[in-house]
């Protein structure tokens, strides 16, 4: 069994926890540095990226997470988590954890009322997955070392080494493809 940390300040925390449990692994709620001890991977859920980033800095988690990333710990950001992991946020600088060579634009699909679900084919899975977009960011550029796993008009899921980002919320669907990919394929 693998221990998967879920950053637990806000957002789809409980939904990610349930997906991890469905796969037979152990979720660990991460709110302080000590919670990172012994985990095998870390999920940064959606929510409000500015607020989550502020908590990461205030709690000292930012530096510890960056250190773990340098050591090769797999990490996955969904929606706001993808913003946190971005090296560049369009017209705003960089994410708090700038580990992923992408340029991202906040709320690019519109406001809460513009939220939508879409079926998207993912070649890596050879399956169509349901994607839920809620005030979702848009990846507007990717670096040469970034693999695009899924896209609509622009990339919606990317992978760079041990860092995964999705601009949508896989935790809000009945499917478990993305969580399985993260836990079973990315975490050794």
From Swiss-Prot:
Active site positions: 79, 169, 171
InterPro entries in the record: Class_I_gatase-like (IPR029062), PdxT/SNO (IPR002161), PdxT/SNO_CS (IPR021196)
Keyword Magnesium belongs to the record: no
Binding partners and assembly: In the presence of PdxS, forms a dodecamer of heterodimers. Only shows activity in the heterodimer.
One BP term from GO: pyridoxal phosphate biosynthetic process
Enzyme nomenclature, EC number: 4.3.3.6, 3.5.1.2
Family of the protein in this entry: Belongs to the glutaminase PdxT/SNO family.
Keyword annotations from UniProtKB, A to Z: Glutamine amidotransferase, Hydrolase, Lyase, Pyridoxal phosphate
The keyword Hydrolase is annotated on this UniProt entry: yes
Catalytic reaction(s) noted: aldehydo-D-ribose 5-phosphate + D-glyceraldehyde 3-phosphate + L-glutamine = pyridoxal 5'-phosphate + L-glutamate + phosphate + 3 H2O + H(+); L-glutamine + H2O = L-glutamate + NH4(+)
Sites where the protein binds L-glutamine: 47-49, 106, 134-135
Chain's role: Catalyzes the hydrolysis of glutamine to glutamate and ammonia as part of the biosynthesis of pyridoxal 5'-phosphate. The resulting ammonia molecule is channeled to the active site of PdxS.
Transmembrane segment boundaries: none
Gene Ontology cellular-component annotations: cytosol; glutaminase complex
Pfam families in the cross-refs: SNO
Pathways involved: Cofactor biosynthesis; pyridoxal 5'-phosphate biosynthesis
Protein species of origin: Caldicellulosiruptor saccharolyticus (strain ATCC 43494 / DSM 8903 / Tp8T 6331)
Gene responsible for this protein: pdxT
Entry GO MF terms: glutaminase activity; pyridoxal 5'-phosphate synthase (glutamine hydrolysing) activity
Stated name of the protein: Pyridoxal 5'-phosphate synthase subunit PdxT
Alphabetized HAMAP family for the sequence: PdxT (MF_01615)
